[in-house]
């Protein structure tokens, strides 16, 4: 049995993106030693059959924490916000688990190695958007002279998810941890604490984003160990990339222009790319030229 596993989840709407993620992984020789397992949250039978030829295992995602039906509606894919906190229960026997959202793809295997290395010794390996390329991480509403109200994603989500004012303030100014890509060992203490915090978030707040604020609380309030990886290990700022034409790869915008590890097409700003594989994005090359290139994975 393979020791480590990469997991993702999709419904039928994200089937094509999931396929691209899998292909982006399997093109690397190193992937032969890594299992790939998929959680099904609304895939069609023919899609499951197609995926089964590429991956090690496919299982139906469940509502591992009970959620009121009015919060779910017809969005079964929201199971991704819950089931990722329980993946060792779905796919047992692995030493290390690496979750990658279906709307991401692997550009460099270095990122995979960093995630598996980073989670050793019972730590969470995860990236944050607090990076020089991303600009501001907080917003301020200026009230009078030097007085302002600080707007924080962590604070907002913590309050809307029912966490106390004390906890919301504890996480407010900390770098926001992006749970779209993360790695944990099977015996890491984070799983149980994360599940506890997730249950509280789901009880009071929306399903969307609940797993992310729950993990931020787990790290910054419960003080569980973390290895924060560079932003290029989960790059979501798709409009600020450069292209290295010599090496034929995407790189960070600023020097030393490190190769992007995982391209993550998350957020409304990237809808046009997620929903249109043929969309051409303008990219600056390392030579200062402007080229047009597709930013979906193309095998």
Model-derived regions, located:
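Glycosyltransferase catalytic domains, chiefly GT-A lineage
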Residues: 1-299
């Amino acid at each position: 049995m393979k020791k480590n596993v990469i997991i993702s989840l999709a419904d039928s709407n994200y089937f094509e993106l999931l396929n691209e993620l899998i292909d982006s992984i399997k093109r690397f020789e190193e992937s032969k030693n890594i299992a790939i397992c998929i959680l099904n949250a609304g895939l069609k039978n023919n899609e499951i059959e197609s995926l089964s030829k590429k991956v090690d295992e496919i299982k139906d995602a469940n509502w591992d924490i009970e959620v009121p039906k009015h919060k779910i509606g017809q969005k079964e894919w929201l199971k991704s916000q819950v089931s990722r906190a329980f993946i060792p229960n779905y796919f047992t026997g692995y030493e290390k688990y690496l979750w990658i959202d279906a709307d991401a793809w692997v550009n460099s295997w270095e990122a995979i190695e960093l995630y598996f290395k980073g989670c050793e010794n019972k730590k969470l390996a995860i990236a944050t958007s607090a990076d020089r390329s991303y600009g501001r991480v907080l917003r301020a509403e200026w009230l009078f002279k030097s007085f302002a109200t600080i707007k924080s994603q962590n604070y907002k989500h913590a309050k809307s998810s029912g966490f106390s004012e004390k906890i919301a303030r504890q996480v407010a100014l900390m770098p926001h941890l992006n749970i779209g890509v993360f790695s944990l060992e099977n015996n890491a203490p984070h799983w149980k604490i994360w599940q506890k915090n997730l249950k509280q978030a789901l009880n009071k707040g929306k399903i969307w984003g609940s797993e992310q604020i729950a993990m931020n609380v787990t790290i910054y309030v419960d003080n569980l160990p973390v290895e924060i990886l560079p932003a290029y290990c989960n790059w979501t700022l798709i409009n600020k990339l450069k292209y290295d034409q010599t090496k034929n790869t995407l790189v960070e915008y600023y020097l030393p222009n490190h190769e992007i590890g995982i391209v993550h097409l998350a957020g409304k700003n990237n809808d046009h790319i997620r929903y249109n594989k043929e969309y051409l994005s303008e990219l600056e090359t390392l030579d200062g030229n402007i080229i047009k290139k597709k930013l979906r994975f193309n095998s």
